[in-house]
Amino acid sequence: MNKILNRREAVKLLGLGAVGVVTGSSLMCQQEKTHIITLSYDDGFEKSSIKTAEIYEKYGLSACINVIASRHLDQSKLPDEYHAWPVGDFELWNELKSRGHEIMPHSYKHANLNEVPFEEAKDLIRKCMDVFNDELEGFVEEESIYNFAYNASNPEIEEWLSAQVRAFRTGGGAINPFPYEGMKKLTCTSYGPDNIDKHLEETISKFLEGPSGWLIYNTHGLDDEGWGPVSSWFLDELLERLTEMKHVAVLPVAPALDLA
C-alpha cells in the first residue's frame, strides 16, 4: 500500500511554484497557458462531490464530475466494492451544474463495454444518454463528453460514439496533445485502490517539467470514498498551488476543448 502523505511532506514534494491565476470561468490570458490539467472525478459519490465542488469554488474553478446515470435509482446494486457509498441524484447534479461545474455521463450502470456485445454496448450508452436528456437541465448530447466505465473501450464502440458526442474519455496515456479542433478521443491515467495523493503529485510534477500538453487524471472520491481516493486537504493545497502558476490552466474537459 502506498504511503499517505501528511501536509508537510506534500508541501515539500509538490514544489509547483507560484505566479498568476486562472479560473474556469474567466479563462483569461489563455495564450500564456502551456499546460492544462483536468482532474476527472468519476462515480458521483454524494459527500465527495459536494466537498469537491466546494474546494474548487474556493479557487474560482469548475470541477469535472462524471456520474452513473442509474445509480441513484437503486443504490443497493453495486457494480463492485468500490461503489459502496451513497451517490448523488439529479437534483444535486443540476444544482452543481448551475454553480458552474461540469456534469457529464459515466455510463448507464458502470458496465465494462469491452465485455458485452457491440449492440448491447450501444444500447447501454443510449440508455445513459436518455437519462441525461431527461434529468440534467441544459444537457446536449452532441456537446457532451462520455466517460467510459473502467476507462474500457474498443475501436468499434469508439468509432460509433464519435458521431454521437463531442468527445469521450478512455484509458491510455495521461498526457494528451493541447486541444485541437475536432479532438474526440481523450486518454487518461488513474491510480488505486489506495490513496492517490503521492501518485497524483508525482504525475503532475513530471507533467509540468515537460512540454506543452493536456494532463487528464481520472480521480474518484475524496478521503475514504471510492477507488483510489484523494485526500481533501491535499486537493485543497494542490489547487492553491496550481492556480498560482501562470502557465497552468485547471479546467474541466469542455472548457479545455474550447481552447482549440
Protein language model features and the residues they cover:
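Active-site beta->alpha N-cap acidic-glycine motif
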Residues: E32-E102, L124, M129-F148, R241, ...
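Catalytic domains of cell-wall/extracellular-matrix polysaccharide-remodeling enzymes
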Residues: S48-K51, Y56, N112-S205, F234
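The substrate-binding groove and active-site-proximal loops of carbohydrate-active enzymes
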Residues: I37-G44, E81-Y82, N112-E115, C188-G192, ...
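Generic beta-sheet signal
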Residues: I36-T38, G213-T219
